[in-house]
Amino acid sequence: MTTAHSAPRDNSDKPVIWTVSVTRLFELFRDISLEFDHLATITPIQLGFEKAVTYIRKKLATERCDAIIAAGSNGAYLKSRLSIPVILIKPSGFDVLQALAKAGKLTSSIGIVTYQETIPALLAFQKTFHLRLEQRSYVTEEDARGQINELKANGIEAVVGAGLITDLAEEAGMTAIFIYSAATVRQAFHDALDMTRLTRRQRVDYPSGKGLQTRYELGDIRGQSPQMEQLRQTITLYARSRAAVLIQGETGTGKELAAQAIHQTFFHRQPHRQNKPSPPFVAVNCGAITESLLEAELFGYEEGAFTGSRRGGRAGLFEIAHGGTLFLDEIGEMPLPLQTRLLRVLEEKAVTRVGGHQPIPVDVRVISATHCDLDREIMQGRFRPDLFYRLSILRLTLPPLRERQADILPLAESFLKQSLAAMEIPFTESIRHGLTQCQPLLLAWRWPGNIRELRNMMERLALFLSVDPAPTLDRQFMRQLLPELMVNTAELTPSTVDANALQDVLARFKGDKTAAARYLGISRTTLWRRLKAGAKDQSDN
């Protein structure tokens, strides 16, 4: 998840980020870095591979760097040879399709060269628009040059790729389309800031009333179905209290959005807080990091608590969230030993750092979220019942998209409008009519990825419309563009719907768990656990 960042108080507090790139990416870094100048000290380095490593090692002897941002083979090279964190820019599916759409306006013979592996999912794009699309992958610069020469010999006229690839393509006299977008680079800066927030927290002071701020509020919870109206009413009710809230819902239903809405609505109701910044909203995914790191993150540690601990120790997330809200995402995946420590903090309203002895009073509202059936986890001994009761004083269940059928078409239209507007393409009546004609397909799909999946699907549709703004949005077109809508959508029993939906997604990616997890917005470990749990449930039935 992306955390909203508040500006540091002065330059000494700022994280130090170095961007390492050449040619086109260097120029994009330069433009985007201006947006983050108030949040970090950003230094551009226009070098690659061994020259960059040599320069950076020499520079680190006298200067501090908290994170490096790089991309492609250059980024992988740096990551394998430097000890400081390297944030790798990876093109999104939207980036790839947008670059191919640009190339498709120039020629029907296109090559795409990507680092290490090709993209099998592009087959649908090729068939739908009758393009001659050849994919290649590379590891070294010599390898990349060979792939470019081979594409040219095969009659390919335009090449899509990263900076190294576009440079080599232009050297060979071919049209080059850069694959990275400003949005992807911007996200890399957010990721780098999140990384430095974790590694430099002991040097950051969070005065009362400042800290990490929310991005969403009650008005961002969209949908006019009865379920969503009831949800907004419940959030408004829960905002009258500071009691712990447990949010349950499937992947992609907006659990953090709901948590932020509760946080914002509560503090907006406080008269003494008018015209003041909201207290901190601090979020952590309990299933995304190891047990030892999660313990240090939540409770902090004293100097010398373990090998590699920082001088002076470090405040934990409970201390940082003092006076505000701590959001514990994927609480169902918290290891049992940490559940015991968390329960003690909630009961005593005080936290003791790892390696410390002095309790530190904390005033924190805890909102937790899970996609798991915690009642089942308790029965199987994987979740403490006393912690469950402490966390679930107030309970909020988010409806899956398939149960909000009245919202599906309006949301699809809204997401499609946004994606088209980003490319300066009008949302015409013919597009609206075509989307309406596809409503039966949209309503029949189970939407295992919920809102996130619908938004991604409409982004994909927008890319295709940017190439052909007046297609016939019929079943045949949708079959090629959105093949997942054609999966058998027979009714499933409530006890098997999650497992079957996961298997559908896994089958779509030919068993590739990494790709399926990325599509669903969960970790590969989480996907594995859910598949294992689903298989066990079905064998027990």
Curated annotation (Swiss-Prot):
GO terms for cellular component: cytoplasm; protein-DNA complex. Residues 221-464 form the Sigma-54 factor interaction domain. One of its GO terms (biological process) is positive regulation of DNA-templated transcription. It holds the Pfam family HTH_8. Residues 513-532 bind DNA. Involved in the transcriptional regulation of the propionate catabolism operon. This is Propionate catabolism operon regulatory protein.
